[in-house]
Amino acid sequence: MTKSELIERLATQQSHIPAKAVEDAVKEMLEHMASTLAQGERIEIRGFGSFSLHYRAPRTGRNPKTGDKVELEGKYVPHFKPGKELRDRANIYG
């Protein structure tokens, strides 16, 4: 599901809320989550999961075109850990 599909579905389900308000709310929520992670903070949504940053250590990679070795710097990457309720709900397909 894309962001626009999510907005469309929420606007359809919540017909008493204008579609523009739904779009603004979704965009604001995602922006707030991104800025929270950018500040190094963790986000926990009970029953859904948590978002945090994991450190990826420096390593040697390869240029896919030339095969040359490339030194990659260490960096922080976003990480999502699903909560138990979400894992259980998703497991109905497994």
From Swiss-Prot:
One of its GO terms (cellular component) is chromosome. Disruption phenotype: Decreases expression of genes encoding virulence proteins. Drastically decreases survival in host macrophages. Decreases virulence in mouse. InterPro entries: Hist_DNA-bd (IPR000119), Histone-like_DNA-bd_CS (IPR020816), IHF-like_DNA-bd_dom_sf (IPR010992), IHF_beta (IPR005685). SMART domains: BHL. Keywords: DNA recombination, DNA-binding, Transcription, Transcription regulation, Translation regulation. GO terms for biological process: DNA recombination; regulation of DNA-templated transcription; regulation of translation. GO terms for molecular function: DNA binding; structural constituent of chromatin. The keyword Transcription applies. The keyword Transcription regulation applies. Pfam families: Bac_DNA_binding (PF00216). It comes from the Bacteria. Heterodimer of an alpha and a beta chain. Belongs to the bacterial histone-like protein family. HAMAP family: IHF_beta (MF_00381). This protein is one of the two subunits of integration host factor, a specific DNA-binding protein that functions in genetic recombination as well as in transcriptional and translational control. This is Integration host factor subunit beta. It comes from Salmonella typhimurium (strain LT2 / SGSC1412 / ATCC 700720).
